[in-house]
Amino acid sequence: MKVIFLKDVPNQGKKNEIKEVSDGYARNYLLPNQLVKIATNNSIQTLKDHLKADQEEKELAKAQTKQIKKTLEELTLHFKLQTNDDKVFGSISSQDIVNQLKDVHRIEIDKKKFIHFKNINKIGINYVKVKLDFGIEALIKIDVKEVQKWNKN
C-alpha cells in the first residue's frame, strides 16, 4: 500500500515522504494512529502543492532576511558616553542597541541574537555581529562619541 507519512516514524519514513508499506502494517498500525494517509493521485498532488508553497515561503523569508542584513550593514548607530580624563563612564548594552534599532530605524531584533556581545565602553567605531535567520550574519556599525563631563575645578 502506498502511503504519505504525516509524522516521522522511526525506521519507516519521514514526514511528507511517500512510501510503499505492507497492507497489514498500514491498516493495523499506521492508519489508526494517524501516522499516514493513503496516497491517492489527489493526495499526492495536494502534498506536492503544499511542499511547493512551503518552499516559496521559505525563499521569500530568506530574501527578507537578506534585505534586513543589507539594511543593518548600511546603517551606523550613534551613541554618546561621558568621559573625564580619558576615563569612560558607562557602557552601551545590547538592549541599548536593540532600543535604538527599534525606535529610530524600526527594525526589531532580539538581543539574544547578538554573537559574543560584550558591553561597549570604547570611544570610536565598534562592530557588533548579529545572527539572523537561515544562518545569515550581519555586522552593525556603532559609532561612539565622547561627551566631556563637566569638571567643577
Curated annotation (Swiss-Prot):
Tagged with keyword rRNA-binding? yes
An annotated Gene Ontology molecular function: rRNA binding
Gene3D superfamilies annotated for this entry? Ribosomal protein L9, C-terminal domain (3.10.430.100), Ribosomal protein L9, N-terminal domain (3.40.5.10)
Q: Which Pfam families match?
A: Ribosomal_L9_C, Ribosomal_L9_N
A single GO CC term for this protein reads: ribosome
Q: Which cysteines are joined by disulfide bonds?
A: none
Name its GO BP terms in alphabetical order: translation
* Keywords attached to this entry: Ribonucleoprotein, Ribosomal protein, RNA-binding, rRNA-binding
PANTHER family given in the database record: 50S RIBOSOMAL PROTEIN L9
Q: Which family does it belong to?
A: Belongs to the bacterial ribosomal protein bL9 family.
Q: Which HAMAP family match?
A: Ribosomal_bL9
Question: What function does the entry list?
Answer: Binds to the 23S rRNA.
Q: What's the name of the protein?
A: Large ribosomal subunit protein bL9
Organism (species): Mycoplasma mycoides subsp. mycoides SC (strain CCUG 32753 / NCTC 10114 / PG1)
Q: What is the lineage of its organism?
A: Bacteria, Bacillati, Mycoplasmatota, Mollicutes, Mycoplasmataceae
